[in-house]
Amino acid sequence: VKETRQLPKLEPSNYNVAFLIMNGTFNTEFTAPFDIFQHTKFRKGIKAMNTFTVANTLEPITTFEGVRILPDFDYTKDDLPKIDILVVPSAEHSMDSDLKDEVMINFIKQIDKSALYMTSHCDGAFPLAKACILDSVASTTFPSDIENYKAMFPNLDIKDNVLFVHDGKYITS
């Protein structure tokens, strides 16, 4: 049986919010923000948002907790819709092997050139920092990993004891 790929329906007047997922993404880092952005279509007074996932494959991504997610787009092969907001959730290897993925880091750099906002949740800040897009702004990460963040990226303006930092188009939490 041949399966037909189902792409998400993207309303042209909405913001496009892409979630960068990889094996080991933590469920709540992805699903809770996805839900919040997706539900903007039910709110009055704010611009609605299209939500979709991007990964380096179209094969299922397995979260740290074992949930399998079919990515909407493969950023290594697909023509992607314009991405207004990139969300980088924390993943199991955000502080180590994911930082060696040059294709992913270059994807982040490329999206940063035109995105309205670049966001991370917890250790998702590490790939943003590795892409050098946080070099001139303040940022933060998961509280128990602040010292690792400071050690790995000593040139950054890192804030601790805060829930989030919003500096220009960059939002880290």
Predicted features and spans:
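Short secondary-structure transition/capping segments
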Residues: 131-132, 171
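Structural detector of well-ordered beta-strand residues that form the stable sheet scaffold
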Residues: 118-119, 140, 159, 171
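Conserved anion/nucleotide-ligand pocket segment
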Residues: 166-173
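Aromatic-residue-lined binding/catalytic grooves and analogous aromatic/hydrophobic interfacial grooves
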Residues: 122
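Residues that mark the start of a beta-strand
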Residues: 14-16, 138, 169
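A conserved active-site-flanking secondary-structure segment within enzyme catalytic domains
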Residues: 135-161
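Extended, subdomain-level signal for the structured scaffold at the beginning of enzyme domains
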Residues: 1-118, 126-130, 158-160
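Short secondary-structure capping/turn micro-motifs that flank functional sites
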Residues: 127, 144-145, 166
